[in-house]
Regions:
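Aromatic-residue detector
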Residues: 2, 42-43, 73
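Secreted, propeptide-processed cysteine-rich mini-domains
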Residues: 12-59
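Cleavable N-terminal signal peptides of Sec/SRP-targeted secreted and luminal proteins
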Residues: 2-16
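Extracellular/luminal segments of secreted precursors and ectodomains of membrane proteins
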Residues: 47-48, 52-114
Length: 114
């Protein structure tokens, strides 16, 4: 009985960490934190059936019925931004593998609206 009560209490917090749009913010030495459209677009391609990159907001958005989990999105921004590296996406949707990029620090942002 107690476990069920605890689950009912925690469930809203778990559900609150889902979003319809996310982006990556990055920092490099000598600069400020910026919204990184290249990294965001690159990560957005990881889920092609469930997401699309919005050129106007520079955010990755979900298609109807899909959600982002904020923690997983942020992990991907950090992993690809600072460790594995990422590539810019061309306007035709292909990846330009001629220049692998990394940044000094990265984080994810998933605003509730926008």
């Amino acid at each position: 009985m107690r476990a069920f009560s605890l689950l009912a209490l925690l469930l809203p917090f778990v559900a609150a960490n889902t979003h319809q749009q996310c982006d990556c913010w990055t920092w490099s030495a000598g600069g400020d934190w910026i919204q990184n459209a290249d990294l965001t677009h690159y990560i957005c391609l990881q889920w092609p059936i469930h997401t699309y990159f919005d050129d106007k907001s520079n955010r990755c958005k979900t298609v109807k019925g899909s959600v982002f989990y904020g923690g997983l999105w942020e992990e991907n921004c950090i992993e690809y931004g600072t460790k594995q590296g990422y590539y810019p996406v061309r306007t035709d949707g292909t990846i330009d593998t001629s220049k692998k990029m990394t940044v000094g620090a990265a984080t994810g942002s998933c605003p509730n609206r926008g």
